[in-house]
Amino acid sequence: MIDKNVVARIVEEWLEDKSKFMAIKEVSERYLELRQNALDYTFEQMNLQLENDKQVYLAVFDIPVESAIIGNKTKTLVLVFGLNIHIYCANGDAVTGLEQNAKAKQAMQSLFISCPQALDEMTLTHKTDFYESKNVRAYLKTRKGVYFKELTGETKKERFLEMLMRNVTEEVNFRH
């Protein structure tokens, strides 16, 4: 016999925070740690002087990947303003030093110059936990905090932000 109160409580929790129920852990602990460390990185740690509250200094994109390998369905692109381009794979592998590619670094600089245009369609959030999705999840960090948007392609600014991201991934031969 199914307890209707238990079902009602679960549905209520799901409606309040769907991300709890979407967090399918087909990712390694190392991946989660690398990803969270990137999201926790502050402009103070970088000794960076930001010009305004809309200047983005960190961009993190969780990108779904077509893969038959369990634990390898997501890759995260991490861009640190003027410094680094990294890719973290859900299985825990990390590819670093991609900023050595001059074209990739130029694409990253273009992203940081242009991505603040998308902030007004994003949500300032404290929730950065990983979850699976068929869409790219974008996190842009400013002095005010982390802005989030799941890129569904519904708006011009979403498509623009995804295009900026793909310009970087194409230069580092990232396979989605």
Identify the residue ranges that each predicted region occupies.
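Acidic/histidine-rich, surface-exposed loop or edge segments in extracytoplasmic proteins
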Residues: 85-98
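Short, internal acidic amphipathic alpha-helical interface segments
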Residues: 103-135
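Short, solvent-exposed coil/turn segments at beta-strand boundaries
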Residues: 78-86, 143-145
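Short, surface-exposed coil-to-beta transition loops
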Residues: 70-77, 133-134
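Long, positively charged binding patches that form subdomain-scale interaction surfaces
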Residues: 63-65, 92-93, 102-105
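Short, charged, low-complexity patches
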Residues: 100-108, 112, 158-166
